[in-house]
């Protein structure tokens, strides 16, 4: 899971609050694996970052500290101790795809079960340091947001929604999404990165609202 995704979401919540009463937001979370080849046992997070980005241990610690500071200012806790590991997220994406399929089209982002599950997964991984590739953990997290634990466990035990995840990942790759977070506004405009709220507000006002006028 990408730490910048939760930071990006927390910033975007401020954008939705800014437009309250003017725009109704519907948020869908789409699958994107930063590390699709991550082994079942995961990988030490510091070692992974140093290997993947070619940086030193000091740089890795500095980056982690910066992320933690930004998240703290937004009300989210990163507890990335020395035991913190990167995890394979494919099965989490399968559950998220299931949760998205359960939502009614008119459901709001802030109350949708898919968003609730995504945020619970962020907390489980980054705050509680739980193994979000473990099926028992994933079933617990699903149940914590009101989803059926038995159905979640059955999905995880099989391959349900796996093909849907792969197809959607391929689609977004074809749309030139190469990293996350990536926000698709109005189904047609991509804004990459965890941008500040003011930037999103300008884009929505000048592009999305103007196009709808």
Language model features: what each stretch is:
Residues 4:
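Short, cysteine/histidine-rich loop/knuckle motifs that typically chelate Zn2+
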Residues 7-21, 25, 29, 97, ...:
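C-terminal cap of thioredoxin/glutaredoxin-like
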Residues 9-125:
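Structural alpha/beta surface segment adjacent to cysteine/selenocysteine redox centers
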């Amino acid at each position: 899971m990408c730490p910048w995704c939760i930071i990006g979401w927390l910033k975007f919540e401020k954008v939705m609050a800014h437009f309250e009463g003017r725009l109704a937001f519907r948020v869908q979370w789409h699958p994107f694996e930063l590390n699709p080849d991550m082994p079942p046992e995961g990988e030490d997070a510091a070692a992974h970052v140093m290997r993947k980005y070619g940086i030193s241990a000091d740089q890795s610690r500095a980056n982690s500290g910066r992320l933690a500071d930004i998240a703290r200012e937004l009300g989210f806790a990163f507890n990335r101790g020395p035991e913190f590991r990167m995890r394979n997220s494919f099965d989490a994406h399968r559950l998220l795809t299931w949760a998205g399929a359960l939502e009614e089209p008119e459901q709001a982002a802030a109350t949708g079960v898919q968003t609730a599950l995504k945020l619970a997964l962020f907390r489980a991984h980054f705050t509680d340091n739980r193994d979000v590739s473990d099926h028992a953990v994933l079933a617990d997290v699903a149940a914590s947001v009101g989803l059926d634990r038995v159905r979640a466990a059955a999905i995880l035990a099989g391959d349900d929604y796996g093909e849907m995840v792969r197809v959607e990942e391929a689609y977004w790759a074809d749309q030139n999404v190469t990293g996350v977070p990536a926000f698709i506004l109005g189904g047609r405009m991509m804004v990459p990165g965890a941008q500040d709220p003011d930037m999103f507000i300008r884009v929505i006002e000048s592009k999305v609202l103007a196009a709808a006028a």
